[in-house]
Amino acid sequence: MRTSSAADERRLLIGVVIHGPEVVDTGFALQAIEWLEGHGDVVAVLGGTMGRVAVIDAGLADRIDISRRRSPSQSVQDLQHSDLTVLLNHAKSRETGLVFGAIVAARARPMNPLIQADSGGRFVAALANSSGISNVIADGLASDFGFDVLDACMPDDNLRQEGDAIVRRMSGVLPGERISVNGTVIGTATDTCVEIVARDGRIVGARGIDLKMHGLEKLPHVDLRYAILRSGSVRRTAGMLKPRLGSIRKSGNGRFAIIDHAAEDSFEIASDASFVITIGDDTTAIAGDVLSRLGIPVLGIVDGDLDGICSGLVLPEGSVIVRVRAGNDDKIGKAIKSISENRRPSSLDEALDMVRDVAGDRIVSVIRSDGR
């Protein structure tokens, strides 16, 4: 009788990369992980910041590693030691899902098999290095979840060179959606056909976008080939559970952080802060939602409609939103940044006094949050 060798008995090691909050909010991430655990040992990691919020809300932080902020392609590279890697996503459409998968595969260039399971587009696709094992897993996922098996698309269709400029096309955009680059909102879509033009690391134009100039001014050097482009809300789905708010921090270390762009980096920027000053409507909305899970209060300086900013938004307990006259949030924020270099506020209330002194009669209203 043939005896089993160690190799025969070794279970598959399956890497899983979860992208974005929607695949968590809909429940598919957990369902897929549990399905894959029936076929091997699973190591699950996350890509992106708002996905972290969804994982915390769903109570899955013990099953999905959210300790580091890594892009999907970086996470795929990190898991190359596994027998295969599964990319879980929930795209707005089948088209955008296929484009996303192709971009991740092209950037990661993994050595092991990579497949994508997309609950938004309802498909499974082999992205790289197909093998007998990965084909079995892909077919099984498609069959058990009722998805179609599709061919991956070409990765470079959305990028081209025009003279000395780089042009990148976005897929699946709807008119009226906000367009962000690396977490900074640069404008609003006016068409379904959206293209962004960059030269020498700066965005110099766009097609199908009503550009927001002060959003562009906040952007540092941008490599458009690898930038994270997003249309619409940073979290299109409601969480499965009530947001899990962190206990309000009582630390007296007096450390604070200022976030005036790249709000999706809030976990890293504010990890040991007692409070955070956020500048701008979009930045305050995103950072406030993220920091509420850490229990870090926010002093937000905004100039927009508070109903629009706070609708469905969870702010940390003890936060304060200062609404100023239109066009003044960035100016006041810049002044606060300058002053705080020499006069560092030790508490949120002290920082609020600084804002009152700087803003004066430009303040429209001050609203305190109770964390809801």
Question: Language-model features: where?
Answer:
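Conserved mixed alpha/beta catalytic, RNA-binding, or beta-rich assembly cores of soluble enzyme
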Residues: R2-R372
